């Protein structure tokens, strides 16, 4: 019997019967974080939408805790898995707290009435994501970054075993970006929440992930640990970089070096020369 908590086998995804990415296979244990990376338009969102049953897979299986996802009822699936997508949600005449509370609907009766215990869970989700100051504000009158935090609270309010997020940090400033990912990582470690997300920030993907899935157009190019993915020239190759490169040693993107005969020789160690390198590059001065 397999020990994997969530896995896919022979998964093919696409639109209107036309395959986009074939033979998607990955395995996750409970409490692991999987990050999808790859160029724009490579198919990361299509994969995520297929995992959450928003798109019907063209072939293969998705298995959650030993049960095929397509055999689960909608209510059971919603209790196991919650989602935060990049698509805009615009509920009219609802406060942020009321939007968060909709995450409890899979647990309510047909009239959708929340119990005192449900409201305690709502309040805890609001507190966890630090949106107390937004709770009574009209959801439509908040910024994109604030909406993203509200939707995370809504997803956590569902008390899922698996959390799926599509580019969750896109509209967040630096403070909330780090806070957002810290919350997710803490819940994965302490509550064994399994997380599947897509990110454009490679430095954050390298730091937060247990596993990384590299999407390249019509195929999955690699699946492995960050140490197996963020090494050598692979990231530069995956993204087809021509105006610079990804430095696997520092985990940073670097611009094309200034051409010409070096006029300056920099001696440094332990990353202490980075500020000098940056300044010389800005001034267009070749260095070695």
Ranges and model annotations:
Residues 112-113, 138-142, 146:
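Conserved ABC ATPase signature
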